[in-house]
């Protein structure tokens, strides 16, 4: 992601690799009368024991009413519902009959009570099974001082309020803790965290939406939000930050920040990263995946990520709210075609950023000096196709090991290396030999030659 391990790059560059939308997106859409024209995520979790993806979501029916001053957004009274779905593969979702709410004379539906919050996070360190799920719910308007109540649940459905509510109270200030995306347990900082719009944008020092972070050791005692990310001189003047979903991978924090362009009312995600969870870097200022291409696509206007990405089975699963309207004018223009639904974008877990080598001649990556534990070196790579027009060489990655005296080690030079040519994760070898255990704990550098290929990551085992 960054240059932390990189000493130099020659004829090679770091490239952002976009997440790919699943071809069946939207994966959760309106197909019941109680779901209206709006579906948006409340929470998405992966249950490793049951091997199920679980989603709590909201529904509603919106329309634009024309007034002398222009269209205004309205909600059909009583249309806002809460519901639940699950999936075995993350793509095809089932909406079970929960039998909890009556709708048009029947309880055969997947609706949940209005006072049933979606889980804010699942707590891996909770010793009380009845409190394994935590839900935090706003109780006041965003334009007034806001409070938040804490609820506990053993299963994500049956909730008990914390007796000391509220656990968050922004008074006397006008509160602004949302859009709120809970990270849950932060394994690097060893604390629970949430990211949010940290002040009401009209009252922020910049007069814009910005992203903050708050932390708690127990879900009850929260610190004041700290503003982390604000638009800078490289951004367009109409750029604001609507929300951020953050998660950790290896020793990095990764964030999907929602870029909001107020002129065209469009939202799209940008990938950012941090090594301490506080100072974030925006090296790759381009969409991590794109809005819908065609007018009327369910996500042609806005992509909101209000659920932390899930890492499972070697892939990152990003469930997002896609909308083809943002403003009352857009809602009025789309009419019956206006909708919000839930899409899915994925990518392999190490493939966020790659080092791309040249097609005609190899690019060279030289790492900083480091020591490792393990016996063998593995690379995760992708081989590009041969380009007849450029007469490019076949994909090829080779590795050289440099000792603490900055000289290539005998038998581990580039000319000794067995070339890696196919997409996937491969063990590195030199003349058929891969054992590096004698170098365990010794400072070394790697010199990696990359031609017509992408290098995603390397790891010692």
Question: What residue spans do the PLM features occupy?
Answer:
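Carbohydrate-active catalytic/glycan-binding domains of CAZyme proteins
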Residues: 1-461
